[in-house]
Amino acid sequence: MDASVGENPVAQSIAQAMIEGFNKHYRIFRETSRRAKESFEAAEWQAQIDAVRERVQFYDERVDEAVRRLHEEFDADSLDDSTWQQLKLQYIGILMRHKQPELAETFFNSVCCKILHRTYFNNDYLFARPAVSTEYIESYPPVYSSYYPQDEGLRTTVRRIIEDFDWQRPFANLDRDIDNILRAVHEHIGAWPDMEVNCQIQVLYSAFYRNKTAYIIGKAINGYQEYPFALAVRHNPAGRLEADTILLDPWRISVLFSLSRAYFLVDMEVPSGYVHFLRSIMPNKHRSELYTMLGLGKQGKTMFFRDLIAHLRHSNDQFIIAPGIRGLVMLVFTLPSYPYVFKIIKDVFGASKNMDRATVKRKYLMVKQVDRVGRLADTLEFSYAALPLSRFHPELLDELRALAPSSFEIEGDSVIIKHLYIERRMTPLNIYLEHADDDQVEYAVREYGNAIRELATANIFPGDMLWKNFGVTRYGRVVFYDYDEIEFMTAMNFRRIPPAPYPEMEMAAEPWYSAGPMDVFPEEFATFLLGAPRVRKAFLKHHRDLLDAKFWQDVQASIRKGYLEDFFPYPTELRFCNMWSNERGRAHQAA
């Protein structure tokens, strides 16, 4: 691409229109994130949930606006090759001083891909690789603030860190909170080290808001040691603020950013700076996952696909049919050397599935819009994804031709998949249980029931609750990942099975009672879930009430009253109110 910049005024005008479209998108994105602080202060929890749900649509709305503008003002379909080449160069020039160049490049790609034929997707017209560096972009306010405990003491420094967030709601007892923070840190590190000359605490400027909690994210640096932390701040029952816990293990902070959780609301002028800081405390987190959890899902998808293509260049294994029981709706395949599964909607569903392709897509979108409470796997959705034909095992190609012929094409040396979902690979729960000892079975079944309970209180009914539709994560958490029958709890009708008019009817092949499309009889769960003796024993020990319609009806009643359950992305025993409860109890008795 050797055309010089500045020769094509049409390209210059289009580039300006494109950046205006992106800037509008990011302005709305930041306004939504800024309002999260106000909602947190006012305890408007539903507003937080609504903001996350609505934000999912922002990007596509702005892309569609930009596409319409390019068609109406510039007759985009008739642009020649020279103009497309100049357009990218002009756009790069605009981005040289931009605060979000990587996001703006992705926006450019999204707009162009709606206009260009896909044969152009990997050429010089698009950003196949980043063109503008995201290193050292200046920001005001800065990405993070630095505090120096040598100057004013550790206790005063911790107080100032918290007070600098300027929440317009008082703390119930900030001195007590600081005591708890310092005690938890002391117990974690064992002994206070001497302060080195570089001793400092770096804290990301914006708090991270999700549901009812605000998180202060940072790290302490002392000599060659770094100590990451995430401080959770919540409202107490009286409506005042209090520090709920401080997470100090990097893996626990990583769980906070799990894709099975709702996205954060964070006000960022320079998102790449936030991602860079977060990776310094969670080096095993991919940048694509961090962008996604910050609400920048399209950027997460862009970076994920670049990582996948890079992995394919440096590996030689083949895509194969995923192990486990085949699904009735999805064809699932995987690349053994890459920790993800790829899901394609079949052309024809199993006989028991009364739905169409549009319904399935709507259910997967629903999962992105709700609070996943750590129990629903997030998905990346792609259209016209090109993967190398040579990497597809012949059995997988045969399966694609037989079950999803309308969903892919072979063009040259590429397989073009027209619509694709990608999820983190997990161990299917049914396979986990087959190889588990008694203790592992009890743990997994308890986790399974807890997942169902937490989803229910978050207004999510899984629908198909077979063990094969749940997976076990690398942290041992049970997560649901089959969404074609998922529904809102409030849409369901949970019923008890009525008595049989005659005893012999209980032995009949067909039920003696009628059932509507949204009717659920929890008593029936035992029939298809509890066939294995070890599983049955553990389930009845921990979750017998899930077989009673009353449990489900009570949860529905709570949801309809507007009650929002508390979901903690960390063990409740790590909450300050529980960590030293025995000592408080003894002190109270002594008094």
UniProtKB/Swiss-Prot annotation:
It comes from the Bacteria. It holds the Pfam family AceK_regulatory. It catalyses: L-seryl-[isocitrate dehydrogenase] + ATP = O-phospho-L-seryl-[isocitrate dehydrogenase] + ADP + H(+). Keywords: ATP-binding, Cytoplasm, Glyoxylate bypass, Hydrolase, Kinase, Nucleotide-binding, Protein phosphatase, Serine/threonine-protein kinase, Transferase, Tricarboxylic acid cycle. One of its GO terms (molecular function) is phosphoprotein phosphatase activity. InterPro entries: AceK_kinase, AceK_regulatory, Isocitrate_DH_AceK. Its main location: cytoplasm. ATP binds at residues 322-328, 343. Its EC number is 2.7.11.5, 3.1.3.-. The keyword Disulfide bond does not apply. One of its GO terms (biological process) is glucose metabolic process. This is Isocitrate dehydrogenase kinase/phosphatase. The lineage of its organism: Bacteria, Pseudomonadati, Pseudomonadota, Betaproteobacteria, Rhodocyclales. The gene is aceK.
